Amino acid sequence: MSSTDMAVLLLVIALIFLIVNTLDNPLIMIGTRLIESTRVKVGPFIHVLERDGDRLFVIEPEQTLLYNTAGLIYYYFEGGASRRFCPVGEQAIVRIGLTDIGLINENGIYNVSCTNTSSWDLYEHFKNDSFEWKLPTFYEKTSIIDIINELIRYGYVRIGYQ
């Protein structure tokens, strides 16, 4: 082997090493695409139930409830928060109206109150006789505040002064 052949061989080996170890490796990209195509992707979506001018939003897969009536949004706390804020048999809810949004923006304090209407009873009330549809959310990671803002921005929630 001549020195030219050795140089070409070393160059080919270096190029193969470079191709295999780069981030934009076509083999790695194809493998990643194959793995991603086999995963089941269940993104969050919003199940909307409408009855008598009121709307109930069930955010899936967490099953968080937002109730929109009389120009207000009620966000139902679940689990431990209700037990800490309210007596036995009642659930904590956050009331959100235009004046409440102003107070939240000013000092970060939410209007939390208690109700004896459980989220399950409210869901059953709407499930029996209501018009329903689903809204997709196009973000993988969202918070309840992001979802409320999107619902207000696109007009799905009727919010006004009380």
Curated annotation (Swiss-Prot):
Lineage: superkingdom: Viruses
InterPro entries tied to this protein: AcMNPV_PIF-4
Pfam families listed in its UniProt record: Baculo_19 (PF04798)
Family stated for the protein in its record: Belongs to the baculoviridae 19 kDa protein family.
Name of the protein in its database record: Uncharacterized 18.6 kDa protein in P143-LEF5 intergenic region
Species of origin: Cryptophlebia leucotreta granulosis virus (ClGV)
Source species taxonomy: Viruses, Viruses incertae sedis, Naldaviricetes, Lefavirales, Baculoviridae
